[in-house]
Amino acid sequence: MAELGAGGDGHRGGDGAVRSETAPDSYKVQDKKNASSRPASAISGQNNNHSGNKPDPPPVLRVDDRQRLARERREEREKQLAAREIVWLEREERARQHYEKHLEERKKRLEEQRQKEERRRAAVEEKRRQRLEEDKERHEAVVRRTMERSQKPKQKHNRWSWGGSLHGSPSIHSADPDRRSVSTMNLSKYVDPVISKRLSSSSATLLNSPDRARRLQLSPWESSVVNRLLTPTHSFLARSKSTAALSGEAASCSPIIMPYKAAHSRNSMDRPKLFVTPPEGSSRRRIIHGTASYKKERERENVLFLTSGTRRAVSPSNPKARQPARSRLWLPSKSLPHLPGTPRPTSSLPPGSVKAAPAQVRPPSPGNIRPVKREVKVEPEKKDPEKEPQKVANEPSLKGRAPLVKVEEATVEERTPAEPEVGPAAPAMAPAPASAPAPASAPAPAPVPTPAMVSAPSSTVNASASVKTSAGTTDPEEATRLLAEKRRLAREQREKEERERREQEELERQKREELAQRVAEERTTRREEESRRLEAEQAREKEEQLQRQAEERALREREEAERAQRQKEEEARVREEAERVRQEREKHFQREEQERLERKKRLEEIMKRTRRTEATDKKTSDQRNGDIAKGALTGGTEVSALPCTTNAPGNGKPVGSPHVVTSHQSKVTVESTPDLEKQPNENGVSVQNENFEEIINLPIGSKPSRLDVTNSESPEIPLNPILAFDDEGTLGPLPQVDGVQTQQTAEVI
């Protein structure tokens, strides 16, 4: 058995943890096995009740140890799985926190970028609003200054104006429609120098003011505002038409002067209407207001013309301002050619009057001297003022503004044909109702910026033609032809300027559109870049997330494979351990069986020696029949007591020991019965008292007597049954064999 323990320990030496855990239990099992298989010499002095203290069978303890080890391994594996699960959960929690942190950072970054864009957009809007406010304030200041400057010279000119009494006639209101028409031809026929002076008063003074150079440097929008200020309104055109009709019938050179209050109210009503509205809708609203008040203005002006008194005002002379103009006007007049078809008026005038004519013309009003650049409307506007809103609405390229053109006065060379007729104009003023001094007749050849868009030379020619017609000294057809020629030139100039202005506006509009398109393209490009960047970032994050998930999935699969591999290895190790235990058990059983057979052989040898000694003792003794019977009876009683002693400590197996004892003692009884039968049956006391005492003291010695009795009673029972040794794989007979061995040893001793 020591070899078994050593072999078991050597076999378990390669298991590591299993060996360390099961070492104490294996030592206990080994001690129990050693205690159960000690040699017979170690327990020779023990009593018969020694069999009651035998340990439990080793295989039962081995099964408990296996169950306990399996339970411990199972608990250890559960602990490892729980720890691994905790590690997985912690790793997933860290990954989730990292992903949430990444999302928070990205969201914060996008929010900061959006706020930055909002702040930048708000700053741009604020700058734009401030710039618009500054432009608006500057424009309002320019308009205010322009209105102030346009009103001051008008008041001053009203003081310079002079006029005579009008010949009121009832035919003013009943004039034919041709004379009330607004067309250029009809107005040009009845133009009077006084009307020319009135029409050119504000514009000529304003455009010839000292700060003209500074105002010409304004922006295009400001220039358009100033040009609209200088554009004549419908009421102005109505007044001009009425004045032309009156001057044609009365043939008077006296200017008609509107009272200051009426002029001031007209300016205060008309001009704010031009600038309160935005630039795009200003012309349309102005035209609507002007059309609505057209008839009222005509009637009021006619009444004023009829009720105004004849006044005379001396035009103040400013030598510093008029000296260059006089030089421009009169220096070229010495070599001027006469108009074709116009006779030289020399016979009807005395030489003194001819010489006095230049002196009378010398002090002209400021509108006669300087070439005036005037902003007026196009000819089609003047033909039908009622249809003006429709025409303005059909011109989207001008953005609702009325077409404005600039008419420059002709230079000194263009005015040369009308200069020789200034002299004859002086005597024609003698029949006037209000006599005027010689210097006062000079304002007659004033430039006429009338609604017919004629220049100063044309008005001068028309005025002189009308005077000569009354005097019978000038051909009106020639004057009309010259006027038409100058109107044609002026119209061509206007058309040219209009084309240039439209081209300039078109260029500006294209520039604005290109700028807006470029800004929109830049904004679109920025948005596309931002969207592409966001898409790329999202794609990158998605790819990273997919890669991370793939890595985690691969890690989980690898861990699952490792766990399955470890589980398989554990199961294989358990199977190997079970196989090893089974082999050890088989080896153990084989060794026990071998030892049992050896003990059986030793017992047989002992029994043979015992039978030989008994046979020799019986042969030498002389016995009697009564003693033998008595001894047999005594032996039977002792034999009957023997099974009680042997069956009591049998641990619930009382059947096995009698069979074993019987099997071991069968040969003894078989061999001893012939000797007993051969003994002489004699009366008296037997000689074998000492041997009988020995048999009484040793219970094993009484077995042959009991067997003899049983054999004599039932001869059918075989004397040597071998059934007890056929089942060599059972564990039950092993303790009984040990009990038999101890009894036989005691018998031998």
UniProtKB/Swiss-Prot annotation:
Modification type Phosphoserine: residues: 161, 165, 183, 200, 202, 209, 219, 235, 254, 282, 335, 365
InterPro entries assigned to the protein according to its UniProt record, in alphabetical order: MAP7_domain-containing, MAP7_fam
Alphabetized UniProt keyword annotations: Acetylation, Cell membrane, Coiled coil, Cytoplasm, Cytoskeleton, Isopeptide bond, Membrane, Microtubule, Phosphoprotein, Ubl conjugation
Compositional bias segments (type: Polar residues): 36-52, 307-320, 461-473, 660-672
Tissue: Expressed in the skin and cells of epithelial origin. Predominantly expressed in the suprabasal layers of the normal epidermis and relatively abundant in squamous cell carcinomas but barely detectable in basal cell carcinomas.
Compositional bias of kind Basic and acidic residues: 62-91, 104-151, 372-390, 406-418, 478-627
Region named Disordered: 1-91, 104-180, 307-688, 702-723
Coiled coil ranges: 89-152, 477-612
Residue list for modification N-acetylalanine: 2
Molecular functions per Gene Ontology: signaling receptor binding; structural molecule activity
One GO biological process term: establishment or maintenance of cell polarity
Cell compartments where the protein resides: Cytoplasm, Perinuclear region; Basolateral cell membrane; Cytoplasm, Cytoskeleton
Reported function: Microtubule-stabilizing protein that may play an important role during reorganization of microtubules during polarization and differentiation of epithelial cells. Associates with microtubules in a dynamic manner. May play a role in the formation of intercellular contacts. Colocalization with TRPV4 results in the redistribution of TRPV4 toward the membrane and may link cytoskeletal microfilaments.
Name of the protein in question: Ensconsin
Organism whose genome encodes this protein: Homo sapiens
The organism's taxonomic lineage, starting at the top: Eukaryota, Metazoa, Chordata, Craniata, Vertebrata
